[in-house]
Amino acid sequence: MEQVIPKVPERPRRRITRSEEPEQLRSESEFEREKSGSKDSELDLPPVPKTRPNRKPLASSSAHASSDDVSVKPEPQIQAQLQPEAVIETEPTVEHPIVDELEAKLPVEQPVLDEVELDEPVTQEVEPSGELLPEESTIKESLEEQIIDDFADEPVEEECKEVASPELIGDEAIQDEELEKPVKEEPIIQTDDKTLAEAIVPSVCEESEADIAEEPKETPEDASEAVVEAAREESSEVSPEASPEVPPEKTQVSVDQLSSTANLTEGAKEAPKEEQKETSEATSEETPEDSSVNAKPLFKEVTPGNVSSKEAIPSNTSPKEGSPATQKKKQGKSPPVPKKPSSKIAAFQQMFQNQQLQPEHTPSPKEPAAPKTGGFSGNRAQFAQNLNGMIALPGMAQLTPALAKRLGVSTSSDDAETGAEVETKNTKDEAELPKVPARSKKTRGPHKRLPKTVASIEKVETKSTSNISVVKAWTISFKPDLPERADDQPMEAELTAGEAIAPSEPAGLEDVEAEDLNEASPEEPLQIISESGNSDESEIQHTSDPSIAQNVEHEEEVHEEAEAAPEAEPEAEEIALDTEESNPTAFIAETYDEDTEVETPTA
């Protein structure tokens, strides 16, 4: 069989044609054109240069031409922003005259532009693509001359000079630094040239006064820039007639440039504003004299000989030592705080040292007291005083006044008083000692006593209704042995004659009870036989009951029979006694009742 060899799949290859680039990689110019609809619309905007046009430096500052390069945003972008996007015109419109009018109505001083030029990075010089028409240049020249004449006629500079003190007029370095600060731009309003000039100049004065407080914070690099600007102002102020001769392209400022300067100076203005707030708070605390000293003239005629690099660098930016502000700081300083001890042990040692030194430096005033009987005198007294504080004695440690007040204890000044007064004061002090509040204990009643609510209850005593009485039911008496009787007379007669049987007491409650017992057991009469220790004879006591008498007779007969029997058989006699018939006490356990009859021995 033929083996089937599997085919190996071919390796995938990459595409030769690549996909379209994403929107992020497209150039910004193409993206903006698509967004604004320049392809579809009939508006033809001029080409945008890659770099911004640079202003050519003035003739007076040709030496510093390298640092005067300014990059300005192109005009077409702002022109597109000013025109609404929704409106699409069929015919192209010329917008140059509108821009020129705005430029003419918003004059900007030279220092502002110079500062912007220094802050912006240097770019390559590229000539602008658009050229100005001859009619526009003539209009710009006429507007510039009119604005310069308006500034020359205004007396605002004189008012600012009057505010400044004559002492600081000669300080040229500070004036040059003032001119370096930017000027706030006023909003664009379509009004006459004179009204615009009047509105701008007061704002320049206010901003220059606020910038004076920031002068000490400038670095020497800023001072070198101030020298360059001072030289530029020199040429502009000394020869105002020469300014119109300068070509309008160099001196004129467009709306584009103003927008770029506004964007660039926003970051630079935020930091000075914060510093102005701090400095304004510090200057508000000073006296009116200080405010007059800080006020400085805004404008000053500068000649080429007066400007020098040494004058531009401020020598002493710190305030003078003799000024009242520094005097207030010196007076307002609090005294140095004493160092606290590092631990409680160090604090205690320091307190103990102060207590030992206290009686030596501040002796307490001694009152006239009565002479003590057992006191020292002469050299001994002086010796005793020298020992003060060297040997520790009870009560010698002096308390601090705060602790003494809290405890209510007398201080060391009381030691000089007499013995009697000291004793009385000690008793008062003990009474004045604050009583420490005792801990609240649980409320307990009196020890081993019931509370009143329980003790007031009456106790109930139970009385038994049964009465117990003790009665003599019968008695037993012992007599000597009787002689043997020869004749067989009945024992009953002898007993009655000799009164051997004691009669019972008269019938009463006891007899009634005994009768009840006899009735309950008539067959078993109550009978007790007691034997004497000297003889075998026994005396029988019985009651008057006839049943007992019969039993006695029966026992007598038995006794006689025993006597008649021979004495040689005593054992048989004992056996006869053990029987139930011969045992006279066999019935007692059954009939005896402890409740009714109690045995009472006679005396």
Swiss-Prot record:
Subcellular location, principal: cytoplasm
Biased composition regions of type Acidic residues, renumbered to the chain: 169-179, 508-522, 558-581, 591-603
Superkingdom field: Eukaryota
Composition bias type Low complexity, residue spans: 349-358
Compositionally biased residues, Basic and acidic residues: 17-42, 180-196, 267-280, 422-433
Region described as Disordered: spans on this chain: 1-91, 163-381, 407-457, 478-603
Cellular compartments annotated: Cytoplasm, Cytoskeleton, Actin patch
Keyword annotations from UniProtKB, A to Z: Cytoplasm, Cytoskeleton
Bias kind Polar residues: ranges: 251-264, 305-326, 529-550
Composition-biased stretches (Basic residues): 438-451
GO cellular component: actin cortical patch
Family named by the database record: Belongs to the AIM21 family.
Summary of the function given for this chain in its UniProt record: Involved in mitochondrial migration along actin filaments.
Protein name: Altered inheritance of mitochondria protein 21
Organism: Kluyveromyces lactis (strain ATCC 8585 / CBS 2359 / DSM 70799 / NBRC 1267 / NRRL Y-1140 / WM37)
